[in-house]
């Protein structure tokens, strides 16, 4: 009887220990997790369990236009997805901590340029990098798992200098030496710069390219 009981309880204990050992990522009520590198997320969530190690996760700010309204008749305001890169050990609970947003003006302003930090189980800051992605089309139709997969693949190739990132303590801008790039790399870099530029910069780029 004891052997039978052990056979049933041991897998449950091991499964429980495995679940407890996962890295847990939590976001506040006005943020949501869209995609994670090591698992497929079918619906945006506020909490997710991740394996130990390096993480790449897509999140976004998503708040009622009026943060104090119960009916939400004014709709929601969302930011562009933000790619977060960080590392964590088994058993850690990593929390995304953002400043308080109280007014409609604050919500709209914050959605354009979200700011936050990551903390660990002890409440200490977790080092991370973040990059705001520009996704065209309707957010409802976007496949964020595919979008993240493209970013993960690009980061592993390392054929081109990485885009500027915002860290927990500083903001840096990558410097590119065009002379060190192959023609194919230079062509791809020009395409990336054009696609990520705003309308004004694109017009100036076209005028420069045409010699106007």
UniProtKB/Swiss-Prot annotation:
The keyword Signal applies. The keyword Signal applies. It comes from the Bacteria. This is UPF0319 protein PBPRA2789. Keywords: Signal. Residues 1-21 form the signal peptide. The lineage of its organism: Bacteria, Pseudomonadati, Pseudomonadota, Gammaproteobacteria, Vibrionales. It holds the Pfam family DUF2057. Belongs to the UPF0319 family.
